[in-house]
Curated annotation (Swiss-Prot):
It holds the Pfam family G-alpha. The keyword Cytoplasm applies. Residues 174-182 are annotated as: G2 motif. Belongs to the G-alpha family. G(i/o/t/z) subfamily. This is Guanine nucleotide-binding protein G(i) subunit alpha-2.
Length: 355
């Protein structure tokens, strides 16, 4: 009897080859689909990272889209100066020029209608300009850790002349600096290095967290954002709770969650620019009384990094990938995200048995 291969055997071998090919293709397709979850406490920079993805990977904001942010820029600017002026009363700081008290009254009288209309009328921009130039207002701004103030306050107020122009169109940087509280889940899609990313930005305030849970299934990596500059601030929603401590508590619960045993965890220690400005004026012992190092950027930032990384209870099997970031700096985010993507590619290929 010869060793001829029957037609059935040949067909079976072909089928088997085809199944293997399909499995491999499915594996490669799965390895190319990346589900990224952006987590972190409120105001840690998650939404700014999402905006950067649009700028870096999707041609940025069109002129029309930038125009739509004009009302948000005005609202952020008005809210910022109002927060400072209100805080002056609580902190018992007087205006350097008593005439500014009239401007403060004007500010509160005009701001409501301006915000509703998404405008910055000339009389209101004049009021804001005079208030912002007052030494008493500047002294109060210098104590902003004692009340709630947007990070972008000085950015907009210092540039009032430009944004108050009647033909003003926000720049990409203006858009990046806007602050709108994220409620619910914002999903962004983009392609980079032959990977198809789905990025989910989840509201960070406590009231938002119960909405996170169903997002977790099948997630490739978590980017956890921490505002380095929040070490001397309290929460907007709980004035007893230090923001950095809240962030550590949340990171602990995410990093050691049984659901995320196989999920890459990437830690963005964000707002490094604000932290560098602040650390020489406001000691780290406000947040960590046991800290004995210098109030210098490198030493203090390394200490915070070790505090977060030490929360990882599975150091032997789980690595935390830490990066220092400035979410409003496009080049920095581009550089960091490139490194993050390489880690994801490597881990993905490993999971699919292709590495």
């Amino acid at each position: 009897m010869g060793c001829t291969v029957s037609a059935e055997d040949k067909a079976a071998a072909e089928r088997s080859k085809m199944i293997d090919k399909n499995l491999r293709e499915d594996g490669e397709k799965a390895a190319r689909e990346v589900k990224l979850l952006l987590l972190g406490a409120g105001e840690s920079g998650k939404s700014t990272i999402v905006k950067q993805m649009k700028i870096i990977h999707e041609d940025g904001y069109s002129e029309e889209e930038c125009r739509q942010y004009r009302a948000v820029v005005y609202s952020n600017t008005i809210q910022s100066i109002m927060a400072i002026v209100k805080a002056m009363g609580n902190l018992q700081i007087d205006f350097a020029d008593p005439q500014r008290a009239d401007d403060a009254r004007q500010l509160f009288a005009l701001s409501c209608a301006a915000e509703e209309q998404g405008m910055l009328p000339e009389d209101l921009s004049g009021v804001i300009r005079r208030l912002w130039a007052d030494h008493g207002v500047q002294a109060c701004f210098g104590r902003s850790r004692e009340y709630q103030l947007n990070d972008s306050a000085a950015y907009y107020l210092n540039d009032l002349e430009r944004i108050a122009q009647s033909d003003y169109i926000p720049t990409q940087q203006d858009v990046l600096r806007t602050r709108v509280k994220t409620t619910g889940i914002v999903e962004t899609h983009f392609t980079f290095k032959d990977l198809h990313f789905k990025m989910f930005d989840v509201g960070g305030q406590r009231s938002e967290r119960k909405k996170w849970i169903h997002c977790f299934e099948g997630v490739t990596a978590i980017i956890f954002c921490v505002a380095l500059s929040a070490y001397d601030l309290v929460l907007a929603e709980d004035e007893e709770m230090n923001r950095m401590h809240e962030s550590m508590k949340l990171f602990d619960s995410i990093c050691n969650n049984k659901w995320f045993t196989d999920t890459s965890i990437i830690l963005f220690l964000n707002k490094k620019d604000l932290f560098e400005e602040k650390i020489t004026q406001s000691p780290l012992t406000i947040c960590f009384p046991e800290y004995t190092g210098a109030n210098k950027y490198d030493e203090a930032a390394s200490y915070i990094q070790s505090k977060f990384e030490d929360l990882n209870k599975r150091k032997d099997t789980k690595e935390i990938y830490t990066h220092f970031t400035c979410a409003t700096d496009t080049k920095n985010v581009q550089f960091v995200f490139d490194a993050v993507t390489d880690v994801i590619i490597k881990n993905n290929l490993k999971d699919c048995g292709l590495f």
